[in-house]
Each structure stands twice: as C-alpha cells, then as structure tokens.
Curated annotation (Swiss-Prot):
PROSITE patterns linked to this entry: FUMARATE_LYASES
Entry-linked InterPro entries: Arg_succ_lyase_C, Argininosuccinate_lyase, Fumarase/histidase_N, Fumarate_lyase_CS, Fumarate_lyase_fam, Fumarate_lyase_N, L-Aspartase-like
Protein name, as recorded: Argininosuccinate lyase
Places the protein is found: Cytoplasm
Organism in which the protein naturally occurs: Glaesserella parasuis serovar 5 (strain SH0165) (Haemophilus parasuis)
Superkingdom per UniProt: Bacteria
GO MF annotation: an example: argininosuccinate lyase activity
Documented EC number(s): 4.3.2.1
Gene coding for it: argH
Length: 458
C-alpha cells in the first residue's frame, strides 16, 4: 500500500512501480528511519498531537521493530513497500493500529529521508575512522620494524634518492591522517538535523527543532527548511572523502604491486592475500592490491554521478535525489573493505632488506649528494648539477657506480673534489644528511613514528 493513494484514480503500472520503488536499496536506512520516528513521536507529543499514553505505545512498538530488524536489515525485503519510510509506517500500523497513522503528522518523506541519510552518514564516519586508525596502526608497526630497511625512493619510476621502507610507510600514514581529519570536518557539517522542515516550507507545528536535533544526536537543527530537504552535501562530502582516500589506497596498492614484482622483489605478500593461476603453477598474484586499485574507479564514479545528478535540480526536493543512495551505499562499503584489506596486506608482509639495499645502491641515487658536496666546496648549485650530470654519464659508460670512480677521474670533473668525497657517497651519509623535519634521516623517521604512536593512542 502506498502512502499517497487518495489523489489517484488508477493504480501505478507494475513497470513504473518497480522503477519508482526504492526499498530494494534504501532498506539499509531501516534503523535510522526508526530512530528518526522515535524522535518525531516525542516532538509531536510535545505539541499535543498525541498524548502520553500514545507516545509510550508508539515508542514501545518502534523499539520492538528496531530489535526485530537490527540483526539482519535484509528481513525488510520480505515484504513489499515503496520505500523504507512506507515499510516502517506499515509495520507500525500492524503493531498499534490507527495510532500508527498519527506518526506522520507534520512530517514529510522529504525531511524524513534527509534525516535518515544524515544519521546514516554520521554512523559511517565513525566506523570508517575506526578502520583508518587500524590501518595506520599497521603502517606504524611495519615502519617501526623496518627503520633500517634502506630502499630506493622514486620519481618518474626512476631511482631518485635512498629512503627507508619505514619512511615509505609513514608517507601513507600521513595520507590516511588527512583522510581521517577530512571525515572529522565533514562530520561537523553533517551534524545538523533537517527533521521538522516538512516538505519544503517547514512543519506547521511549533516543535522545538533544536531539542529534536539534540534528541537524535545532532548538534543543532538546520536553519532553512528549503535548503534542508534539498541538501545532499553530506553525501557528496562523504563521497569526496572516500574518493580521495581511495586514491591514496590505490597508490599504496600500486606501490606494493611494483615492489612485489619479480623485477623488484622488494617485498613478498602473504599467501593469505594473494592468489594463483589456473594455468601457470608458479604464479602468486597480488590480487588484494589489484582489487583495491580496481575498485577505486567505482568510488570515483559514485561521486561524479551524484554531482551530475544534483547539478541541475531546482529547489526543493526532486525524485532525482533518490539516486543519492545506491552510489553512496556501494562506495562506502567498497571503501571500508579496501581499508580493511590494506591492513590485512601489511600483517604478514616481508621486506627483502638485502634486495632493497642493493637496489638503493644502483641507479646513481647518490648523485644529489655529490652535487651537495660540490656546493659545500663553493660551487654554485646549477654548475654543480651540470658537473655531476657529466660524471654520471661517464660512470654509466664505464658500468661503474659513482663511488667506484678513482680520485683522478673525479678531479677531471672538478679540482675541488678530494678523498673526502667517498664517505659522502655512502648510503648512510645519504640518509643522515636528510635531517630536516620530515626527512629520511633515521632519527627524524623515529621521531615521526613516535609522534604517530602518540597520536593513535589519544
């Protein structure tokens, strides 16, 4: 039974009914819809629409319904209804009879779905932040165990300068910290309650909306009824946060795919997060990482899709806005799964420290140190840069590392070069010199790890 049949003389075509109905996906809002209905029952009691006995009966029935639904939201789908709001009201009427028909007084599905979505988004923020913290803890744990694991750092996928695996881990810790704070910021803006805004012009009853907001766990009520039922910024912000974070996770996955390859062999991923080939017995494929990378596009698509949906909508509510749900439900489920699987990938990861060190010693990753050495000897950096470039070209032609060139050959590039150049070209020196805050110096990395642990323990 629809909630709006009085105006119509014909029943909806079954094809349209399926096209229009949303219960098959918005059933996920069952708990939020029930919670909002409990809050609304208290609100209409406060202005005399229902008496105390009716309030008690309504709340008891709604709480009973919540207890029935909470263990498995999908039980909602066992019965037919247009949407989750209709389903909850119909179940309530079954429990309390005509009293259930009073609950919707002064309320529209427009403000009802708006509050449901905000309640749902708020709950997702808290759950996602918990998962992000768990992944950060794994990154810090892995960093702490690999502070001496020297490896090449890359630009343009070319060896650039030596770093440590710990420094690499902490780079992703920082990205996730921004993801965490982005959710915190979004939560502040979604922490306003639209219930009581009616269809668009506000409710006709003198309800204390700020009290209603606080009862539902919001900081305050929204300020404009027209905006309240039209607003989906909270969904967009959550999708934007998800998209940025998924981009970070995809880069994390891509790095590990490269590090795990036979050509790099910097890390070995556990059997628990890899799979084999149906044809090639030797294969051990990084499927967990590849799926994180692959699923990123789904989340990006949800954001761009909703932006396109909302961009041309006149105020206030339009049925187009029903399209906010499937994308956000899938995107958040995907994001949560990718955060969790990324933490699992780190649990048993093995770093081949001999191989990473060997790679760090190749590719002339110490060339910048030679340029800095020349600068310390009074050579302008741009000139030093050119000199070192010539030295690298020569070393490549001789199939030698820079530190393998003899002093006479170094002096052919510039006379200021002396024996003291050789210690400068060592991996230890390369790391030690990067001692400014945020650098790869071992003490700075240890400080970053300590600060991260303190932050995670707060």
């Amino acid at each position: 039974m629809a909630l709006w049949g009085g105006r119509f003389t014909q029943q909806a075509d079954q094809q349209f009914k399926y096209f229009n109905d949303s219960l098959r996906f918005d059933y996920r809002l069952a708990l939020q819809d029930i919670d909002g209905s409990i809050g609304w029952a208290k609100a209409i009691h406060s202005v005399g629409i229902i008496n105390q006995a009716e309030l008690v009966e309504l709340i008891a029935a709604l709480k009973q319904l919540r207890a029935e639904v909470a263990p498995n939201l999908a039980i909602v789908l066992q019965e037919d209804a247009e949407d989750i709001h209709s389903w909850v009201e119909l179940q309530l009427i079954k429990k309390v009879g005509d009293l259930g028909k009073k609950l919707h007084t002064g309320r529209s599905r427009n403000d009802q779905v708006a509050v449901d979505m905000k309640l749902w988004c708020k709950a997702q923020v808290l759950s996602l932040q918990e998962s992000i913290r768990a992944l950060q803890e794994k990154l810090v744990e892995t960093a702490e165990a690999n502070q001496l694991s020297v490896m090449p750092g890359y630009t343009h996928l070319q060896r650039a300068q030596p770093i440590t695996f710990a420094h690499w881990c902490m780079a992703y810790y920082e990205m996730l910290e921004r993801d965490y704070s982005r959710l915190t910021d979004a939560y502040k803006r979604m922490n306003t309650c639209p219930l009581g805004s009616g269809a668009l012009a506000g409710t006709a009853y003198a309800i204390d909306r700020d009290l209603l907001a606080q009862d539902l766990g919001f900081e305050t009520a929204t300020r404009n009824s027209l905006d309240s039922v039209s607003d989906r910024d909270h969904v967009l912000e959550l999708l934007a946060a998800a998209s940025i974070s998924m981009m970070h996770l995809s880069r994390f996955a891509e790095d590990l795919i490269i590090f795990n390859s036979g050509e790099s062999h910097f890390v070995e991923l556990s059997d628990r997060v890899t799979s084999g080939s149906s044809l090639m017995p030797q294969k051990k494929n990084p499927d967990a990482c590849e799926l994180v990378r692959g699923k990123t596009g789904r989340v990006f698509g949800a954001l761009s899709g909703l932006l396109a949906t909302l961009k041309g909508l006149p105020l206030a509510y339009n049925k187009d806005m029903q399209e906010d749900k499937e994308g956000i439900f899938d995107a958040i489920e995907t994001w949560q799964a990718c955060v969790n699987i990324s933490a699992l990938v780190l649990e048993d990861i093995k770093v081949d420290t001999e191989r990473t060190k060997e790679a760090a010693q190749q590719g002339y990753a110490n060339a910048t140190e030679l340029a800095d050495y020349l600068v310390a000897k009074g050579i302008p950096f741009r000139e030093a840069h050119h000199i070192v470039g010539e030295a690298v070209v020569y070393a490549i032609s001789q199939k030698k590392a820079l530190e393998e060139l003899n002093l006479d050959k170094f002096k052919q590039f510039h006379s200021v070069i002396n024996d003291d150049v050789y210690p400068i070209l060592s991996l230890d020196s390369c790391l030690t010199k990067r001692c400014a805050k945020g650098g790869v110096n071992l003490e700075r990395v240890a400080e970053a790890i300590a600060a991260a642990k303190q932050n995670l323990n707060q």
